[in-house]
Regions:
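Bacterial N-terminal signal peptides that target proteins for export
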Residues: 1-9
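Generic cytosolic/nucleocytoplasmic N-terminal low-complexity/intrinsically disordered segments
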Residues: 2, 24-26
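Acidic/polar surface patches and capping/hinge elements
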Residues: 27-442
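Repetitive helical segments and hydrophobic/amphipathic motifs
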Residues: 12-13
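C-terminal segment of classical bacterial N-terminal signal peptides
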Residues: 16-23
Length: 442
């Protein structure tokens, strides 16, 4: 159960002359179902989408936050602050954390921008100049006046409450030393960098919604002497080799695309496109991104709980090992993966988990899996086309085999865990009152 914070007495009373002029924007009663869909007719995305895009931008700047803090935490805190600020004014759903008494006539767009700015300034202090400059751009779009001033003040107070709630969640603790165990199946530091194991303390972070990091812990991976392991070993050895002759050009493009940007950023880009295409209202967008990024953050916590419970080796270690642990696998000491291997255990697979969680959220929110979209990464000059959320998720899953990063059992486990985490998050949060997105109020 999420303990909500009460902000009592934050709603200011507007002057009567402004009240009559702004009556169309009054906070609707919670039993009403209608939400105005003004975004589709607008020439630019609303502030929720614009700040989600800014979040993606500043989060990937090298050194923007400590390497030990998982980026999905920053995304979730920011989007929860935006959601609670917007919902507090429009009253179209249950708050996630802050039991809000929002100013009835305040601008929800100003509140969204202010909440995002406040959260990001605190979480990414090195990026404050860029964040504050973007905030001024937002205000130029929104306008000025008492409604905007109230929205700005309210968004700041809500975000500050969310930040205070997460200040002692364990994310700031230093990375835990991980000393690899010897023997077949055990994770070893991966070449070429042989960097220390990463995100070792993420499983100790307090989840946003899950009851514990191990609530949906993955089952043990297949035994090294099993037929499944041998089959998955052979698949990655063939398709994931750096100079593979069995991997097609399209499969190489898939591996290149999904390895070129953080997968949680890619799925926020998908959500941006879908939000525009489906004509979401501002409150729907606030709910969408809060549900998406909270699911991704709790997926990260669950993922690393499983990774460091089993500390299973990566293909680069398994395939080049002298002792394979299975008479039906044939190693190759000269084998290299198509892409350099991440510095954490292989099981479960992160791309599969995050992608399954994200696609589950998007299917649930929009009520359909069908959505045609394109994703381009100009850094590697690759564009991928999709006709469904699940199609993109499946491709992200396969990409890590083509890249030589994972075995199929890693990916299958990640998919199952991501689906379960997202389902739990959406079943227990973000209830709404008749408009689009997740589960209606019961």
């Amino acid at each position: 159960m999420i303990k909500r914070i009460a902000l009592v007495g934050t709603a200011a009373v507007m002057a009567m002359s402004l009240a009559m002029a702004a009556i169309a924007n009054a906070r609707p009663a919670r039993h009403r179902h209608h939400v105005a869909r003004t975004h589709a007719a607008s020439t630019q995305p609303d502030q929720v989408i614009q700040w989600n895009e800014e979040l993606q931008k500043v989060l990937v700047v090298p050194g923007a936050q400590p390497a030990s803090i998982h980026p999905t935490r920053t995304m979730a805190i920011t989007q929860i602050a935006v959601y609670d600020a917007v919902t507090g004014i429009l009253g179209q759903g249950e708050p996630f954390l802050v039991d809000i008494r929002g100013p009835r006539f305040a601008s929800p767009e100003a509140a969204a921008a202010s909440a995002a700015r406040t959260a990001l300034d605190a979480l990414l202090p090195s990026q404050q100049p860029a964040i504050d400059a973007f905030f001024q751009t937002s205000l130029a779009q929104i306008g000025s006046g008492p409604r905007v001033d109230q929205g700005v003040a309210y968004g700041q107070r809500v975000a500050s409450a969310v930040l205070a709630n997460r200040a002692s969640d364990g994310a700031a603790q230093p990375a835990l030393a991980f000393i690899p165990f010897p023997g077949p199946g055990e994770y070893q530091l991966t070449p070429p960098a042989l960097a220390p194991a990463g995100f070792t303390q993420v499983a100790n972070v307090t989840p946003f919604v899950l009851r514990s990091a191990g609530q949906f812990r993955a089952p043990a991976p297949p035994a090294l002497d099993s037929a499944q392991y041998a089959a998955d070993f052979s698949q990655t050895k063939s398709l994931g080799e750096k100079t593979s002759t069995t991997r097609t050009a399209d499969e190489t493009a898939i591996a290149t695309f999904w390895g070129a940007a953080p997968v949680w950023v890619v799925w926020n880009q998908v959500a941006d496109q879908a939000a525009v295409a489906f004509g979401n209202s501002v409150v729907e967008n606030a709910r969408l991104f809060a549900g998406l990024d909270t699911s991704l953050a709790d997926s990260a916590i669950a993922l690393y709980d499983s990774k460091y419970t089993y500390h299973r080796w990566r293909p680069i270690t398994a395939i080049t090992a002298t002792d394979q642990g299975n008479p039906n696998t044939v190693g190759d000491p000269n084998w290299l993966p198509f892409a350099n291997t991440a510095n954490d255990p292989g099981y479960p697979g992160a791309h599969a988990e995050f992608s399954q969680a994200a696609s589950s959220v998007l299917r649930d929110f929009f009520g359909t899996d069908r959505f045609s979209f394109a994703l381009t990464n100009p850094t590697v000059n690759v564009t991928r086309m999709f006709t469904s959320f699940s199609g993109a998720s499946d491709e992200a899953n396969a990409s890590r085999i083509f890249a030589g990063q994972h075995f199929q059992y890693d990916e299958s486990s990640g998919q199952r865990q991501g689906s379960r985490v997202a389902g739990f998050v959406l079943d227990h949060t973000f209830e709404h009152f008749g408009d689009r997105g997740f589960h209606p109020h019961r």
